[in-house]
Amino acid sequence: MLDFLRVTGLFFVTAVAEIVGCYLPWLVLTQGRSAWLLVPAAASLAVFAWLLTLHPSAAGRTYAAYGGVYVVVALLWLWRVDGVVPTRWDLVGGAICLAGMAIIALQPRAAS
């Protein structure tokens, strides 16, 4: 269970790095913010890619499980950064995504 919590925490940090790396260019392109924001955006996406290499499972399984956490972090971003309160539908969808992530992450593993 401790490994599950560690991996979930790593997924959370990975999702934040990805969202920041995409949000900053969005600010530049849609809100007229300084192009200098592209520098930390690129750094954030590089950190995101590096963080993905730290996950213990096969890449495809890691990306599938990570997707559930990403959805929840994006909903938190919607609420805290964009100032939009998630709807009941958003929350139910996020819960379903987390359930899918847990099923993937907690599946029985063959003994090595």
Curated annotation (Swiss-Prot):
Instruction: Quote the subcellular location field of this record.
Output: Cell inner membrane
SUPFAM superfamilies, from UniProt? Multidrug resistance efflux transporter EmrE
Which positions, given as ranges, span the membrane? 9-29, 34-54, 65-85, 91-111
Q: Which UniProt keywords apply?
A: Cell inner membrane, Cell membrane, Membrane, Transmembrane, Transmembrane helix
**Topology class, membrane:** Multi-pass membrane protein
NCBIfam families according to UniProt: PRK02237.1
Q: What family does the Swiss-Prot or TrEMBL record give for this protein? A: Belongs to the UPF0060 family.
Which HAMAP family does the entry mention?
UPF0060
The name under which this protein is listed is UPF0060 membrane protein Mpe_A1656
Q: Which organism is it from?
A: Methylibium petroleiphilum (strain ATCC BAA-1232 / LMG 22953 / PM1)
